[in-house]
């Protein structure tokens, strides 16, 4: 995917270099005159609080109260009009206007202000008042330059239009785009909501290793590194699952972790090699309990982040307030295949040769290492991913996955070959994956052996055999349910973001050309 728009014209680059040179000269003069970057100003108020408390007062009421404030922020608007000037500053909460004139601020201070630039950090001390137009402002009796900006901000009309620059220079994006700031505030609120609800449900938050001697807990290709002191190969974790289940073995019956995972795979609008997940495990629960609990978590996160569970995503309504539907893989294929221009009978979905032919028509390679020796369950899953997955707009649990693609999930007591597993899809994206955990050490060891066979046959994403995890299970693990929720994709839903890079502060990009 190419995020680049047209490069800036040469004249714009020349103009920017000229502006930077001028600002460096101003900074040099500041250094000559004393402390160029003072660090002794402490604000007493934030912009949002001033507006909340005093916007409703009339000009006369505000003047009578004589509210004295100290405020600081980045100058994002400047108007010089002879003996009076206005500046709008932006702090972490919002914006407020400064009023500067010769009489109140002093002619020398006002004169110095005229040479300050957009992007500079400035502080003001003075009384609140309202202009003739009714705008709440600070009448500056004391005004200072706190930090000089050497680079010009993008102009407010064109903004930051180049997507790669937006992602690479997120600091500029956050300065000039309130939408981006709101996105990451919503992300923070959503994560805080998840954490709060986990703690309220008596889960304990833990931290497990990021460097693993054996990659495990998911089927994915890991990043590889080397531990110099121990002289051993290590892997950035692809999932914390096996460590969290070790903690359940150890007696922590409800645990969760919010942290990074790393998978050495492709980059796309819905994939970033470094991503955030929340995984949680609860003893004496199963996948049905997990589905109910996860549904409540996501609904609460939406309300806490955006104030409602009924959202708009990419121009369509997304209602998280209604019960999430639950379908098996085959039920989903039959229900949604028409939206991919297909029509199937239920009996056809038990025909491996038929499914292989359909996969080939859809551009898939049925002879790939993943599918070459696949059983009917894995083939059905591949067909689901081809013709149904992208059409699951409303929240949908796909349940009862085949055992051959679920090496860590408990097998159903009544349906051999089927596991008690679900994946949650919303707007055609996988958001969560959970299951009743396999706690039979001998069964788990046999499944690891089959994974090793698949890896030896060319499947790079197949799991390794983790002997220590088997040893942990041999001490006994209670019946347990576990689930992982993709935080980045969840935030995409909550903030109407079309690309996962829009919700990650510093997404992965190609190396910048010097």
UniProtKB/Swiss-Prot annotation:
Positions of Mg(2+) 2 binding: 430
Co-factor note (free text): Binds 3 Mg(2+) ions per subunit.
Cofactor(s) the protein needs: Mg(2+)
GO cellular component, one term: cytosol
Catalytic EC class: ligase
Reactions mediated catalytically: tRNA(Lys) + L-lysine + ATP = L-lysyl-tRNA(Lys) + AMP + diphosphate
CDD domains to which the protein is assigned, alphabetical: LysRS_core, LysRS_N
Compartment list: Cytoplasm
GO molecular function, one term: magnesium ion binding
Binding-site list for Mg(2+) 1: 423, 430
Biological process per Gene Ontology, one example term: lysyl-tRNA aminoacylation
Source domain of life: Bacteria
Keyword Cytoplasm: yes
EC identifiers of the protein: 6.1.1.6
Oligomeric and partner information: Homodimer.
Classification via NCBIfam families: lysS_bact, PRK00484.1
Similarity comment: family membership: Belongs to the class-II aminoacyl-tRNA synthetase family.
Protein name per its UniProtKB record: Lysine--tRNA ligase
């Amino acid at each position: 995917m190419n995020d680049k728009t047209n490069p800036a014209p040469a004249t714009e680059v020349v103009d920017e270099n000229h502006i930077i040179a001028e600002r460096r000269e101003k900074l040099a003069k500041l250094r000559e005159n004393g402390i160029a970057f003072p660090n002794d100003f402490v604000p007493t108020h934030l912009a949002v609080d001033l507006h909340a408390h005093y916007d409703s007062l009339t000009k006369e009421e505000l003047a009578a109260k004589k509210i004295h404030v100290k405020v600081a922020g980045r100058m994002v608007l400047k108007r010089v009009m002879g003996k009076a000037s206005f500046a709008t500053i932006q702090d972490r909460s919002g914006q407020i206007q400064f009023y500067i004139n010769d009489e109140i601020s002093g002619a020398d201070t006002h004169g110095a202000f005229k040479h300050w630039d957009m992007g500079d950090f400035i502080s003001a001390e003075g009384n609140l008042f309202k202009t003739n137009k009714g705008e709440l402002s600070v009448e500056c009796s004391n005004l200072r330059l706190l930090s000089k900006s050497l680079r010009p901000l993008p102009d407010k009309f064109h903004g930051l239009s180049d997507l790669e620059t937006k992602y690479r220079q997120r600091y500029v994006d956050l300065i000039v785009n309130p939408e981006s700031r709101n996105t990451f505030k919503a992300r923070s609120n959503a994560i805080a909501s998840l954490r709060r609800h986990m703690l309220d449900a008596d889960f304990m938050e833990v931290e497990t290793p990021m460097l693993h001697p054996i990659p495990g807990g998911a089927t994915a290709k890991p990043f590889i590194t080397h531990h110099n002191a121990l002289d051993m190969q290590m892997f950035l974790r692809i999932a914390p699952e096996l460590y969290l289940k070790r903690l359940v073995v150890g007696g922590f019956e409800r645990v969760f972790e919010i942290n990074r995972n790393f998978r050495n795979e492709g980059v796309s609008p819905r994939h970033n090699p470094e991503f955030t997940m929340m995984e949680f495990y609860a003893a004496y629960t199963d996948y049905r309990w997990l589905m109910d609990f996860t549904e409540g978590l996501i609904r609460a996160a939406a309300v806490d982040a955006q104030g409602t569970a009924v959202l708009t995503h990419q121009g369509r309504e997304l209602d998280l307030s209604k019960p999430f539907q639950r379908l098996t893989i085959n039920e989903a294929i039959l229900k949604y295949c028409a939206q991919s221009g297909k029509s199937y009978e239920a009996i056809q979905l038990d025909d491996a040769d038929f499914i292989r032919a359909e996969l080939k028509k859809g551009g898939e390679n049925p002879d790939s290492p993943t599918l070459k020796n696949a059983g009917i369950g894995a083939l059905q899953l591949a067909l689901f991913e081809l013709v149904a997955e992208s059409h699951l707009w409303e929240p949908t649990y796909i349940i009862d996955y085949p055992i051959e693609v679920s090496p860590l999930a408990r097998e159903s007591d009544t349906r051999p070959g089927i596991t008690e597993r679900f994946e949650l899809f919303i707007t055609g994206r996988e958001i969560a994956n959970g299951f009743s955990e396999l706690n039979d050490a001998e069964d788990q060891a046999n499944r690891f052996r089959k994974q090793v066979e698949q890896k030896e046959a060319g499947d790079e994403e197949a799991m390794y055999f983790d002997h220590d995890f088997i040893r942990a299970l041999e001490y006994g693990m209670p019946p347990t349910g576990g689930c992982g929720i993709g935080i980045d994709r969840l935030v995409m839903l909550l903030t109407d973001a079309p690309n996962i890079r829009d919700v990650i502060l510093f997404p992965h990009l190609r190396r910048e050309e010097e």
